[in-house]
């Protein structure tokens, strides 16, 4: 089969987002898809470079015009968490920059308005900036035009808005800058009182005025041409609505993306149960996430209305407590006589990176924790200036007259003036207002946090209303009244539609009800054949209570059930029990003996082996199905038939079978279309900067899955791509792999390609329209100019929540949440683009998070009903459990391939990082070949089922 290289195009004008296929163009010789350079300077470099090589113009940064809302399904009233905003008058606001700094010494300066990353630093600087700035306002009312009724909106850092121009009467030099000298002692902030001269500068940038009016908001915020929309209106509204929180730093913790947490929650009207202790010296704080969104509103197409979307949430914070107490909470052991190495490492991971403070020098001194030292204050000695040595315990007794209560406890390692120093844990206190980061979580605490944060719809609604009142987003807020900003008290009610359940086709058909169904007895649609050479092994720690008899009993039940489903299976060649040390050697041995399938039963406590199984599977092409011993016990000892059914569903799909299809009465799943899901696994948090600086490869992993093999079967692979890219040059590899496989299996090219793409925020839509979609079209047109493209971005990273109209407390999550099939394609959608929300699944815990689908390209001009019906149908193709999924199966499977790619990359780099050579793109292509599935026999099987 000959490959189809993309044909480079001569330069042409930018394409509008909806185009007929361009006419014939002069072909030019293809340029090889070469290397992206080692460090990309923007998130689009790789895509832009490839477009230039192919001589393809960038696309226009234009959304598609919304089409008429869909009509299928029955109407349902839905409550939202969207509060309408009315701008009742015209107000001109002026933006100024604020800069606050002070000299600590003759050579060292501190800048308070500098942006920070760590929670404590962000909160601390905001607190100080507010103290400094509002003192300046109080002492200089003439400059700040307070008598003229000036309204001030300040972000607690470097941005200030006022309703009166502060520089209307310029001095002779026309300087738009004013510097105030502030005495830190007057601010009321203990940390500032030793600074007699703090410099606060206010200056005006160019073009620093906008006029806030309902007309301007309507015209300048939701245009199809993304580049003409003015983000400053959004920024100003968000700041105005957050002003109460910014000024009251002792009550509210303000964080990124409109998040606010309540530091004294019970005083703000929250329940004690909203603030539970989750272990490790950590406590949940309730909070809100507030975002300004421009929506169509209740009056339909062509309207643009500002709104405030408020979601309730909780996050774990570190308690303000001594580090010694924190160590006790983490370990459950008395730390006064020191911790053993394993416990110390566990505790160190939880406190590393935290800000803590001491007060024994008669002032508050902040330091950052780096770890826990293996020795105590009595055993750690250091040299004094006179050449003598003394222990840390003696030093504190002599210098500070402190007799340590726990002299044999481990010391804490802190960064102090650039060096690591050692401090008694009892004298250091964890600073408040620090959220628990992912590396600081422990298993138990993480589980408890997840459970407590998954609140039911009635609780979430209570949190939203309580929080909205606490942050003073009310009709009585004087600042908002003065600015003419009115936020409605009641959230928007909208009419959604509920699509019908689906018919699942096994040997006989069943209907889904509320996203669930029971598979009928009888054969799979396409039963697989289990390879003749297969084995079953259990691996466990001593005392895991799973015997060889249990293995054989499970295997007997497994074979019996496989046969009932029509699968061809013989008894295994071998069964056995192995220790963790010996199992990998055994698997290597049987793989070398041409064994093609192994059923592994692994102790729940053993988590490191799974990745090793998968690396061996990819390398040897011996399929390894891994299940937990708890699941095996549920089958063997508790007789759980459904668990066994799910295991066999997995086996059949892994071996290339198909369990069921979805009836396609509406003809949305036609044979001539290729449906591709594309998911992204970004490098682990915090590793990008570190790895890039050391010249190590740290790729993002693009998973993809499509129905290239057969219409209802979704199989895929992954590619390694440079990290830090908003647009995917790898869309080229994804499309070539998928189209080639489609042509190989279907003996024809697809007429339509539908891409569901995740991992893209609204902010990257413009770049995807400009670079990624033109690249995708160029690759597709290399096969045929007749193939049409539909490109849909899918995200759950938004703040919208939808609730049933009538909520009764005390029910289950499945009863209280909106049902599967709820679709919304007007009222709450962005008026500039073709968009819909579709709830595909039954929510088993917490409150439903309904995915948002934005159609960025549609050559077919598909009606909304058609896209919604296809998407909902695709939510029923999971094959393993008898439940619909929240996102379409191709995207779900693609995300699993991205995770699998991350695991295989992790195994590849266990022996050490891989150096980034000059041509990073080529190196990543080679490594993709090495650890991906394309070169293996598994590339047509869904091995990650």
Curated annotation (Swiss-Prot):
Gene that specifies this protein: wago-1
Entry function: Argonaute protein which is involved in the endogenous small interfering RNA (endo-siRNA) pathway. Interacts with secondary 22G-RNAs, which are RNA-dependent RNA polymerase-derived endo-siRNAs, typically 22 nucleotides in length with a 5'guanosine residue. In the germline, functions in a genome surveillance system to silence transposons and aberrant transcripts.
PROSITE patterns documented for this protein: PAZ, PIWI
Species name: Caenorhabditis elegans
Name by which UniProt lists this protein: Argonaute protein wago-1
UniProt keyword annotation of Cytoplasm present: no
Location relative to the cell: Cytoplasmic granule
Pro residues composition-biased segments: 1-20
Residue ranges of every copy of the PAZ domain listed in the record: 322-432
Keywords for this protein: Developmental protein, RNA-mediated gene silencing
Other information: Members of the WAGO (worm-specific argonaute) subfamily lack conserved metal-binding residues found in other argonaute proteins and probably do not cleave target mRNAs directly.
Domain of life of the source: Eukaryota
Similarity remark: Belongs to the Argonaute family. WAGO subfamily.
GO molecular function: DEAD/H-box RNA helicase binding; miRNA binding; RNA endonuclease activity; single-stranded RNA binding
Pfam families the record matches: PAZ (PF02170), Piwi (PF02171)
């Amino acid at each position: 089969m000959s490959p189809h290289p993309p044909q480079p195009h001569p330069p042409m004008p930018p394409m509008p987002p909806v185009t007929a296929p361009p006419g014939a163009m002069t072909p030019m010789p293809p340029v090889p898809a070469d290397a992206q350079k080692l460090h990309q300077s923007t998130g689009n470099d790789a895509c832009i470079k490839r477009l230039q090589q192919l001589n393809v113009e960038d696309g226009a940064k234009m959304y598609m015009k919304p089409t008429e809302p869909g009509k299928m399904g029955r109407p349902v009233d839905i409550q939202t968490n969207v509060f309408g905003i009315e701008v009742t008058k015209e107000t001109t606001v002026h933006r100024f920059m604020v800069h606050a700094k002070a000299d600590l010494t003759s050579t060292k300066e501190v800048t308070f308005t500098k942006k920070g990353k760590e929670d404590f630093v962000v909160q601390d600087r905001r607190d100080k900036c507010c103290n400094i700035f509002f003192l300046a306002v109080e002492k200089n009312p003439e400059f700040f035009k307070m008598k003229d009724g000036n309204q001030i909106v300040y972000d607690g850092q470097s941005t200030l808005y006022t309703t009166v121009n502060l520089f209307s009467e310029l001095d002779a030099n026309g300087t738009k800058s004013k510097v105030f000298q502030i005495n830190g002692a007057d601010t009321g902030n203990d940390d500032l009182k030793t600074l007699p001269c703090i410099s606060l500068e206010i200056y005006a940038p160019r073009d620093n005025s906008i006029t806030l009016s309902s007309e301007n908001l309507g015209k300048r915020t939701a245009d199809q041409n993304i580049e003409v929309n003015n983000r400053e209106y959004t920024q100003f509204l968000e700041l105005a609505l957050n002003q109460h929180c910014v000024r009251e730093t002792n009550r509210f913790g303000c964080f990124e993306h409109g998040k606010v947490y309540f530091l004294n929650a019970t005083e703000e009207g929250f329940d004690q149960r909203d603030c539970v202790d989750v272990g490790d010296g950590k406590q949940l704080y309730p909070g809100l996430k507030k975002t300004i969104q421009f929506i169509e509103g209740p009056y339909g197409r062509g309207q643009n209305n500002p709104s405030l979307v408020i979601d309730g949430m909780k996050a774990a914070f570190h308690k303000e407590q001594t580090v010694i107490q924190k160590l006790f909470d983490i370990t459950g052991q008395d730390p006064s006589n020191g911790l053993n190495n394993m416990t110390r490492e566990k505790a160190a991971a939880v406190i590393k990176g935290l800000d803590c403070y001491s007060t024994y020098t008669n002032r508050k001194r902040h330091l950052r924790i780096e770890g826990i030292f293996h020795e105590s204050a009595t055993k750690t000695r250091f040299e004094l200036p006179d050449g003598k040595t003394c222990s840390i315990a003696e030093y504190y007794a002599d210098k500070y007259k402190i007799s340590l209560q726990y002299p044999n406890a481990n010391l804490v390692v802190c960064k102090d003036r650039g060096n690591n120093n050692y401090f008694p844990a009892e004298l250091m206190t964890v600073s408040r207002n620090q959220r628990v980061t992912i590396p600081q979580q422990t298993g138990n605490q993480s589980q408890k946090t997840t459970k407590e944060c998954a609140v039911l719809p009635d609780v979430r609604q209570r949190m939203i209303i309580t929080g909205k009142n606490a942050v003073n987003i009310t009709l009585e807020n004087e600042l908002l009244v003065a600015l003419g900003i009115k936020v409605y008290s009641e959230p928007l009610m909208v009419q959604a539609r509920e699509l019908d359940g689906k018919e699942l086709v096994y040997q006989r058909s069943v209907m889904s009800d509320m996203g669930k169904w029971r598979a009928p007895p009888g054969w799979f649609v396409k039963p697989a054949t289990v390879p003749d050479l297969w084995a079953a092994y259990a691996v466990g720690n001593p005392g895991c209570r799973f015997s060889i008899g249990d293995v054989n009993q499970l295997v007997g039940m497994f074979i019996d059930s496989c046969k009932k489903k029509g699968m061809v299976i013989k008894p295994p060649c071998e069964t056995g029990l192995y220790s963790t040390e010996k199992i990998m050697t055994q698997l290597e041995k049987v793989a070398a003996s041409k064994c093609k399938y192994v059923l592994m039963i692994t102790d729940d406590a053993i988590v490191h082996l799974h990745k090793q199984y998968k690396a061996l599977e990819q390398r040897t092409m011996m399929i390894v199905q891994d299940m937990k011993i708890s699941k095996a016990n549920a089958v063997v000892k508790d007789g759980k038939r459904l668990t066994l059914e799910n295991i066999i569903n997995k086996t059949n799909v892994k071996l290339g079978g198909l369990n069921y299809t979805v009836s396609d009465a509406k003809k949305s799943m036609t044979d001539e279309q290729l449906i591709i899901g594309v998911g992204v696994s970004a490098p682990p948090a915090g590793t990008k900067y570190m790895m890039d600086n050391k010249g190590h490869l740290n790729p993002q992993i693009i998973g993809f899955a499509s129905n290239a093999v057969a219409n209802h079967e979704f199989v895929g692979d992954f590619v390694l791509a440079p990290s830090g890219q908003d647009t995917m040059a790898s869309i080229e590899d994804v499309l070539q792999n998928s189209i080639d496989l489609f042509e190989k299996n279907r003996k024809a090219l697809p007429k339509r390609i539908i891409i569901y793409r995740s991992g893209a925020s609204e902010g990257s839509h413009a770049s995807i329209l400009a670079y990624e979609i033109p690249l995708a079209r160029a690759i597709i047109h290399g096969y045929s100019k007749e193939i049409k493209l539909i490109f849909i971005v899918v995200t759950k990273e938004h703040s919208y929540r939808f609730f049933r109209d009538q909520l009764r407390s005390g029910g289950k999550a499945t009863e209280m949440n909106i049902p599967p099939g709820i679709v919304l394609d007007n009222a709450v959608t962005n008026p500039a683009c073709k968009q819909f929300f579709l709830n595909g699944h039954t929510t088993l815990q917490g409150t439903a998070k309904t995915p948002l689908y934005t159609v960025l390209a549609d050559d077919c001009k598909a009606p909304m009903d058609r896209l919604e019906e296809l998407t909902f149908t695709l939510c029923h193709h999971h094959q393993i459990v008898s439940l619909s999924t929240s996102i379409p199966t191709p995207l779900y499977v693609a995300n699993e391939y991205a995770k699998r790619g991350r695991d295989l990359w992790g195994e590849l780099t266990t022996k050490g990082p891989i150096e980034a050579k000059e041509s990073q793109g080529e190196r990543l292509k080679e490594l993709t070949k090495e650890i991906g599935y394309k070169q293996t026999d598994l590339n047509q099987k869904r091995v990650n089922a």
